[in-house]
Each structure stands twice: as C-alpha cells, then as structure tokens.
Amino acid sequence: MSAALAAAVQPSAPASAQTADRLSHLKRLEAEAIHIFRETVAETENPVMLYSIGKDSSVLLHLALKAFAPGRLPFPLLHVDTTWKFREMIAFRDARAKELGLDLLVHTNPDGLARGVGPVSHGSEVHTDVMKTQALRQALDKHKFDAAFGGARRDEEASRAKERIISLRTAQHRWDPKRQRAEPWHLYNLKKKRGESLRVFPLSNWTELDIWLYIEQENIPIVPLYFAQERPVVEREGQLIMVDDERLPLEPGETPQQRLVRFRTLGCYPLTGAVESDAATLPEIIGETLAARTSERQGRVIDKDGAGAMERKKQEGYF
C-alpha cells in the first residue's frame, strides 16, 4: 500500500482494515462497471467504446477487457481525432491498439478538415462543435452504433453529475435532461425507439481519486503526460499551455519556458492547461489528488465557454 493511499484513510483504524476497506471499495466499483458493460452488450445490437486516450479511457478499456476475458472485445473502439491531440497521446493510442490487437476506428470530420477548423483559427467553441461533436455524430451514424460507452464521471462537472449511467439520446444524438430514467437498485433501462441511441457511462460513480488508485492497483498504462516533466509552456489567461508543435503561434514577446509540469486532464493541446507539479510517480500523483482543492477540469478551456457550456454541448451531442 502506498503512503498516499495510507493517508487517504482514517489513521484510527488498523492498517489491515484500512487496506481491505479501500480495496473492497475499488472492487465494488469494478464489479459495477463490468456489469454495465455486459448488460449493455446483451441488450444492444451494435455498441462501440469511445476512446479519448486519457486516464479514464485507459481504465475503461481495462475494465472492458476484464468484462469479456478471455475473449476479444465484442465491440470496436472509436477515437474522434480532432488532429489537435498531443503527439504523445496519438503515439500511445497506436501503441496500445497494436499491443492489444484492438479494433480501432479513427474518425475526423472531413468538412472541418477541409475548412481548416482548429482551436487557434476558429476558437474553442467552433472547434469543439465541428471537430468533436459533429465528428462524433458522423461516426455514430456512419457505423450505425446504437450504444456508445464513455468514460465520463459524475464528479467531473455539474452536467455530468446529473446524467444517468444509461443516457438516452434522440435520433439526432441530442440529450434531454428531462427525459432521464430512474436507475434504482442498479437496474438499467436500455430500451429505445428506432433511431434513438444510448450513451453508457460505466465510470459514473468513480472519483478522480478512485481512478488513480485503480490505475496503481491494476498497473494500467497511461499517457506519460500525466507525470511531471520539464516541458515547454507559455502562460495565457492563467493557463500553462504546452507548445507541442509549430502550429501554436506565439504572441508578441512570448517565449516558451521549460517548467516542471504535468496534466490532470487531457484534450486538444491548445485547450488544455498543465499544472506545475513534481509528481513523477503514481503515489505522488495520488498524494496530489488527495490534497487538491480544485477540479481536474480547471485546465479545460472549453469548460469556460460561458455558463452552462458543458450542458449545452451535451444537448447538442457532445460526449
């Protein structure tokens, strides 16, 4: 048991009891997620798993492999590629797909690509709508998927906190918060009308701390960007933006500085801020998570696109 894990529990309880409680908590979350995977596959015709390459996707993939072991995954993975992911993320994606023999689908909005839509040229709102939301809807329609697994968690953000594990979407992939279904006693309603689809979130009840403890317990590979390292960054509007390639134009007088940083959350690189940190190991990251007083999504620029931005995006078909 790591020192960070020991610090997470009350010191008054015996160490053995503390470990048992924490592990049983993770085992309960694991069992719930595996049940959701199996139930969805049994009740839908053509499911897919959305794979965004981050820590939650890595845990989600690990759970899916456990749910259907020793067989192959009964569904493909879908990565919506905005062309603005960190280079280390794409390298990690390709390496994991090859290592595990995954059926990986990669989709980029061809219209957005032709128009050159990006976060620098068009801003975060247009980029997110065209290269993420519209691209996702295109891919789901193209392959006729009727259920999509995602790694969203309720503790991340307000609109995600009120979304059900099984989230009904219209034929246009829109989410209506008023049409949510009750889910008592882990009973899930996967029925839908023709043309409707489902978004399924097996990690809904996990916290950021749970994710890191499970990654440590299961030794799950993750993108190196989560670990502290000297990286070239510029500071803009309170965010440390990593200069990942030449596409990020520098402002007058701006010079990238090497700073010891890591990422708590990963997205398109100009829209994702790093945090100053010296946490270079999983126990150190867990310790930082325990001490954190801000959301991991504080570094997501898209969450600052006006009040209710995330809920509005979800209603339009976002993850």
From Swiss-Prot:
* Membrane-spanning segments: none
Q: In which pathway does it act?
A: Sulfur metabolism; hydrogen sulfide biosynthesis; sulfite from sulfate: step 1/3
GO terms (BP aspect): hydrogen sulfide biosynthetic process; sulfate assimilation
The GO terms this record gives for MF are: ATP binding; sulfate adenylyltransferase (ATP) activity
Q: Which domain of life is it from?
A: Bacteria
Under the subunit heading, UniProt states:
Heterodimer composed of CysD, the smaller subunit, and CysN.
Its family remark reads: Belongs to the PAPS reductase family. CysD subfamily.
Designated name of the protein: Sulfate adenylyltransferase subunit 2
